[in-house]
Amino acid sequence: MRLTQGCFSFLPDLTDEQIEKQVACAMSRGLAMNVEWTDDPHPRNNYWELWGLPLFDIKDPATVMFELNEARKSCAAGYIRMNAFDASYGTESCVMSFITNRPVSEPGFYLDRTEGVGRQIVYSIKSYSVQANPEGSRY
């Protein structure tokens, strides 16, 4: 099952050239880039691990691509995404995010049903990879 989070998630994976163009476009608008990774693909997992430091003062897309490639070397078996951060007054938030790296196999999710008090049924989504493997060895 293909994880769909962020921009371009329903399109085929972006090539490095396309990623670099997106980074250049974001930087031309004054956005700061950063790289994040995770091995927990749950849809509500918004807090991925930050790779290195945020690239606030970087003006060259090649530097961002270098950091992305370094993250790919270390975290090749997990998910890696790029974020564009708008630090302008009134926004101060992530305005663009897209996945740049995926594991070879994405086993997907299952629906867990639990009965509570008064026949209340609670559903939760759980990842097959998280259930089967401890953190750090999921992919």
UniProtKB/Swiss-Prot annotation:
The keyword Chloroplast applies. One of its GO terms (molecular function) is ribulose-bisphosphate carboxylase activity. Pfam families: RuBisCO_small. One of its GO terms (biological process) is reductive pentose-phosphate cycle. CDD domains: RuBisCO_small. GO terms for cellular component: chloroplast. The keyword Chloroplast applies. It is found in: Plastid, Chloroplast. Keywords: Calvin cycle, Carbon dioxide fixation, Chloroplast, Photorespiration, Photosynthesis, Plastid. It comes from the Eukaryota. Heterohexadecamer of 8 large and 8 small subunits. Belongs to the RuBisCO small chain family. RuBisCO catalyzes two reactions: the carboxylation of D-ribulose 1,5-bisphosphate, the primary event in carbon dioxide fixation, as well as the oxidative fragmentation of the pentose substrate in the photorespiration process. Both reactions occur simultaneously and in competition at the same active site. Although the small subunit is not catalytic it is essential for maximal activity. HAMAP family: RuBisCO_S_bact. In this alga, in contrast to plants, the small subunit is encoded in the chloroplast. The basic functional RuBisCO is composed of a large chain homodimer in a 'head-to-tail' conformation. In form I RuBisCO this homodimer is arranged in a barrel-like tetramer with the small subunits forming a tetrameric 'cap' on each end of the 'barrel'. PANTHER family: RIBULOSE BISPHOSPHATE CARBOXYLASE SMALL CHAIN 1, CHLOROPLASTIC, RIBULOSE BISPHOSPHATE CARBOXYLASE SMALL SUBUNIT. This is Ribulose bisphosphate carboxylase small subunit. It comes from Detonula confervacea.
